[in-house]
Amino acid sequence: MNKSGFLIFCLILLTLSQGVPLSRNTRCSCIEISNGSVNPRSLEKLEVIPASQSCPRVEIIATMKKNGEKRCLNPESKTIKNLLKAINKQRTKRSPRTRKEA
């Protein structure tokens, strides 16, 4: 094979390998989903993980203050939807307002 043929082969190989992910993790974080409610005061952290190629569903993971336990919550639950609305409402109230300087 001559040099130009080899270079074309390398370029084709590079373009084909560009879309290959480095990680092959194709699992969801949540195996079991709790349908129960969660007291907002007992939450340390609430993570909302959108659906992706590695997991086709939205995942909501609650970390509890007292023991650090992580619970997967049902994103379709009315209680959890209301909890997310309340948290978003609090965030908009807490966000700093910009002032116009004179």
Swiss-Prot record:
Q: State a single Gene Ontology molecular function.
A: heparin binding
Q: Name the principal localization, coarsely classed.
A: secreted
- Kindly give the CDD domains that the UniProt entry links to this protein: Chemokine_CXC
Q: List the record's Gene Ontology CC terms alphabetically.
A: external side of plasma membrane; extracellular space
> What domain of life does the native source organism fall in?
Eukaryota
The record ties this protein, via InterPro entries, to: Chemokine_b/g/d (IPR039809), Chemokine_CXC (IPR001089), Chemokine_CXC_CS (IPR018048), Chemokine_IL8-like_dom (IPR001811), CXC_Chemokine_domain (IPR033899), Interleukin_8-like_sf (IPR036048)
Provide the positions where the record notes the PTM Citrulline.
R24
Q: Name any Gene Ontology BP term.
A: positive regulation of monocyte chemotaxis
Pfam families per the record? Answer: IL8
Q: Which residues form the signal peptide?
A: 1-19
Q: Which UniProt keywords apply?
A: Chemotaxis, Citrullination, Cytokine, Disulfide bond, Inflammatory response, Secreted, Signal
Can you list the disulfide-bonded cysteine pairs?
Answer: C28-C55, C30-C72
* Localization of this protein: Secreted
Q: Which family does it belong to?
A: Belongs to the intercrine alpha (chemokine CxC) family.
What PANTHER family does this protein map onto?
C-X-C MOTIF CHEMOKINE 10 (PTHR12015:SF188), SMALL INDUCIBLE CYTOKINE A (PTHR12015)
Quaternary data:
Monomer, dimer, and tetramer. Interacts with CXCR3 (via N-terminus).
Function according to Swiss-Prot or TrEMBL = Pro-inflammatory cytokine that is involved in a wide variety of processes such as chemotaxis, differentiation, and activation of peripheral immune cells, regulation of cell growth, apoptosis and modulation of angiostatic effects. Plays thereby an important role during viral infections by stimulating the activation and migration of immune cells to the infected sites.
Q: What name appears for this protein in its UniProt entry?
A: C-X-C motif chemokine 10
Q: Which organism is it from?
A: Bos taurus (Bovine)
